[in-house]
Amino acid sequence: MGIQVAVRQDEITDLVTRIRAAIREELNVSSRGLPFRAWDISRAGAVLHMTLTPEGRNSVLDETLEEGRIGWEGETTGSAEVISVLPALSVVNACLTTGQPPKEGSLVYVNPPRYLEALLSLWEDGTRAAEIAQWIFDLGNNRIVWDKKVPFSVFNGLRPAQERSFSLVRWKTSFLWGPPGTGKTHTLGRLLASYLVHHPTDRVLLLSSTNVAVDLAILAVDDAIKDLKPATRPVLYRFGSRLDPKRFQDRKHLTPLRNRQLVDQLRQHYETIPDPAEAELYRKWKQERDRLRDAIRKENLEFLSKARLAAMTTTLAAYDFANLGKFDLVVFDEASQVGKAQAATFALLGKRVLFAGDPQQLAPIAQAASPDVNTWLGQSPFEWTSRSSLKNATCMLDEQWRMAPPISNAVSNLFYGSRLRVADPLSRDEVWIRGRSAMPSRLLGTQNVVLVDACAGARAAARFRGYECEESALLVAALVVDHVLSWSIADVREDIIVLTPYRAQRRRIEAELTTVNAPASTASTVHRAQGSERRIVIFDPVCPTADFVAGEEGMRLVNVAFSRAQCRLIVMLQRGWEQHPALSFLAKQHPPMVLNRDRVDELLLTKLPGPRPTRPA
């Protein structure tokens, strides 16, 4: 194993003190809740359905808020427990626990599950905290500590960088950098499958911060093992009660339960929530809910020691940290979206650790503003890769399979130091080439990357925080109609996505799409789009001079938006775009154009075929 870096006790103590203080500060600030506006509120018994729009820069609606709490007017008027979050629709389903539902348009505060409390309790154990701090200092002496190999030749079609990534697990700490379209999850699945099959006594802990990421990662490993057809199949288990039952319908071997109906029973139980006003009935309902949760957790723990690979969320791992034991390898997927304090904590569970993610896309979110909170909770472990001891332990996947060459070049030059390229085999793939060839339309030519000057500026939004631009919203609707008709698109939502960083602009675009009979759900905010891809992406930055779009985090949003596109990327330009680093760079290769106004007006009078969509969600 690696040699520990000699560190004075006072240095250990100082680091522990600073990280503890950072967690406490973030816990204190986050306990106030993330601010949202509640709209479209309906009630069925004790279940509330509502659309939430963010009121703060850090108010991101995703599934990590499940099992959190919602309060309004300081929780003196009412509160609810979050049952489920549908990020694509900005919808939350919650169980009313006190008071009356919030009023339309009122301010509500969402408190995430008390994950930080569990993290803080781990750091308040003096011995454990000192061990984690020592692990952090030892990064300066990172080295190869495992002399075995993980074969990659057992799989066909791996690219050179993917093959190189199989050697990462030999290092004490390593990083798999997966830019968009490079097949990070696919690679990770094959790496871990080969590792488990060829090293039958080793155990792996697979972590991620969201249930969706955990599901997709373990399914990738399971698929790869299926391809290998080993004589003895390694035991993989997905722990936790928040897995997606549909994904695991034909994968019962991944569910660590003797009574495999427990998860279904829990979901069905949530469909029968009584009105909290019926106190006794509600009390019994909560008792049964807790009984089912405890039964799932108890059975999970009984199966833990049998698992060669245990997959779970970091939230579950934080609460069950003491029961997890030690693993030969800890793999942290989407690690670029968690803070360094969390990453170091869970790294302690393994002899070796592999962090996988993309530091150029969405970063961890911390609400408190102090330097230590930013360093330990607002920066990902990928910040460590600049150290000389970690450079050789980092592998970037450099061939992508999604974007047409001009889009790929733009993303590569802007965000990946010109290292990302179209996968070599695709140069001979006629089907792929045809699918990435942009056809002309009434408004555009055959370019893959198009910059459209809206000849207008952003305005402060009336109903929501942020900005909106009516002129660009109209042009976006015309461009959608143009491509549906010119490209004979049957399902708009399958082929086109409209991305914007501002909810106000999303609502305005949704309204314009509705007038031309296009699905309002074609429009999305950038945060919700990570992980998706479409043939055509229209990106509307709305206010290119705002720090939210032009700052460091804004550039990450731009990267996410650009890299969703397969065949055509259309970028709307408002006044001030010349000051935006990415937009001004792009304009040098792709000169902005002004759309023909008469053709735009004609397209806006067109009604697309099909049933009229429902009003925006």
Regions found by a protein language model. Give the residues of each.
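Pre-ATPase regulatory/linker segments immediately N-terminal to the P-loop/RecA-like helicase/translocase core
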Residues: M1-F36, D40-R164, F239, D244-T272, ...
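Hydrophobic residues on the short alpha-helix immediately C-terminal to a glycine-rich phosphate/catalytic loop
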Residues: V169, L191-Y195, A217, L349, ...
